Amino acid sequence: MKSYLLVPKESIESQARVGPRGTEQGERVLSRTTALRFAVANKAPDTLFALGLRSATLPGSRPPVSGQEERRRKGKGAKSAGTRGADASTPPMPGATVAEQTGAEPGSYRYMPLIGATMAHFYEDHTEKEARGELERDFEFIPDVVPLSFPGPVSAGQPGPRNRGMSSLAEREWPDESGVPLAHAQGIRGAGVMLGILDTGVDADHPEHAARVIQFRYVSLFPNSPHNPARDIRGFDPDGHGTHVCGIAAGVHHGVAPEVDLYVASVIESETIRTSLGRVAAGMEWLLHQFSRPENSTRPAVVNLSLGFPLMPPPGISEADYNLNLRALQTMIRRLLDSNVLPVVAAGNSGPDTVGYPAAFPESLAVGAVDFERNVATFSASGTVGRRGVPDIMGYGVNVYSSTERRCNNQAFYERMSGTSMAAPYVAGIAALYRCRAPDLTALEVRDLILSNAVKLPRSGTHKTGKGLAVFR
């Protein structure tokens, strides 16, 4: 089986661009429009459906097929049925694809219109060849072969108190200089803001999260069958990383923005601590689908991504395929920003003179880590991409206290963990507070506000610290 993300060439950069940062007004050059629409994007699902691939387009129904493509589908369907040994005299089953009629399945696909891409899985080489013949002029076929992962906590963590009253933790954990205690005292706690998390999941029954309704989706490696679509279930997290991230940003007892509406897509496997471009794309599509519902379409949103590509192409992956994956990921990050969603991204834990993606993309608000004494963490990644320094901003990311998944005795568990994975949700929470106070500001204006209000940090000889420590003012 071969898997590809099909992205219209007109919507993807010819190379990962450095962007306009580095000038005073450079940030505002980035697009402020709503989600981009490319007419050619519909061609991919139409063609794949005509070739007999199974549709797994969320929420499980086949996409509409245009009149021209419908005629082509019927012609190709009859030909394909003949080559697969179907009885030409047998009338087709209503609404059934060639694969369902013959028992053969040449592949499956997931159309993601909000990010303008289609994930295709080919089980037969000749079907892939046909698809390329139809689509390669207009689409990049990006092989889904480069693993993404979260930077991982730097330490295993220190246990905290279990099942203890947590009402005052926010004031104890977040220093006065962060502005969090003052914001909470003023009633600014994130209400009305949507916060998306792409991670390992969330323990929805943990005391930090049990009192709220969490929109949760487990994103599988392969698309769900349209006859057995993904179920909406209570959030779970077999690893704990996602639960810790959610607790920092939005825990009801000690989160930075405890009243946000939480949307969690589980895209990282706990066993391998890996994900793929296709799963991240499906997670972003699900988030944008939730954010664009009629009741949500005018509400502000923030997305936290404590994940990234390896710094170099992994063994067995060509530099060309690696760069294609980068370009596709940048296109997806840009979709968030174009949809007025602020993407907050962990810079990574590989130390100075290292810059990873998506943190290095100009569309991302890249976050490094400091401790509670404002000292830069030795593990915090930093570097330069073109004229742009990374990270953009710093957040508390050393020994940060938050929730983890419950243990087998069903006791709630808390730990202190370190990493830019912890610093990013702190900044995402700060962004949610700003968007709560001023919901009419655009995502770019909120980013400008975070950068302009940052607390300056002492110059470091080894690390870049961006504009300083993110705070709420």
Q: What role is predicted for each listed range?
A:
Residues 252, 268-363, 373, 408-424, ...:
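Substrate-binding/access-modulating region of protease and related hydrolase catalytic domains
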Residues 5, 119, 194-197, 247, ...:
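Structural recognition of the beta-strand scaffold that forms the well-ordered cores
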Residues 22-28, 32-33, 37-39, 43-53, ...:
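Active-site core segment of subtilase-fold serine proteases
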Residues 199, 218, 356-436, 440, ...:
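Extracellular S/T/G-rich loop segment that most often corresponds to the catalytic His/Ser-adjacent loop
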Residues 1-10:
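Short glycine-/aliphatic-rich beta-strand segments at the starts of folded cytosolic domains
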Residues 58-64, 68-173, 182:
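Autoinhibitory propeptides
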Residues 108, 296-307, 436-473:
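C-terminal subdomain of the subtilisin-like protease fold in secreted/lumenal serine endopeptidases
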